[in-house]
Curated annotation (Swiss-Prot):
InterPro entries with a match to the protein in the record: Ribosomal_eL28, Ribosomal_eL28/Mak16
Assigned GO CC terms: cytosolic large ribosomal subunit
PANTHER family, per database record: 60S RIBOSOMAL PROTEIN L28
Family, similarity comment: Belongs to the eukaryotic ribosomal protein eL28 family.
Biological process (GO), any one: translation
A Gene Ontology molecular function term of the record: structural constituent of ribosome
Entry protein name: Large ribosomal subunit protein eL28
Keywords for this protein: Acetylation, Ribonucleoprotein, Ribosomal protein
Any Pfam family the entry gives: Ribosomal_L28e
Gene: rpl-28
Length: 126
């Protein structure tokens, strides 16, 4: 099936669609949707090639979706623990996801920032 036909089917009827009060946009919780916005450009279900960046225990998990004959082999997953932002850049470039390269890097950087432990400030009695 073509990407356009899949989008026409799922754009209003999907289990991943969410709405928020006071916001006119519809959001999506699909796995390969980097912006989490319900649009054909960012849809993980409607695109044959997609990239997903999510948090792991330590580091970042990057999943890429490619068009393969078997659905079990269509998704490749790798965990990045050292320099995740540079690794995401390299993975996105090698996999051919140039239009989502910067977006994937930003998401990986935000995940890494959230995982850094903040130093505790000790109170001294004066």
């Amino acid at each position: 099936m073509s990407d356009a036909l899949v989008w026409q089917v799922i754009r209003n009827n999907s289990a991943f669609l969410r709405t928020q009060r006071g916001i006119g946009k519809r959001f999506s919780t699909e796995k390969f949707n980097l912006k989490k916005v319900n649009s054909p450009k960012y849809s993980g279900l409607a695109n044959k090639h997609a990239i997903d960046v999510s948090a792991a225990a330590k580091g970042v998990v990057v999943s890429t979706k490619n068009e393969k004959g078997r659905p079990a082999k269509a998704v490749t997953t790798s965990t990045l623990s050292k320099t995740p932002v540079a690794s995401v850049r390299r993975l996105a470039k090698n996999a051919g996801f140039n239009k989502f390269n910067k977006l994937a890097q930003r998401r990986a950087a935000a995940i890494v920032r959230s995982q850094v432990k903040k130093a505790k400030v000790q109170k001294t009695d004066a």
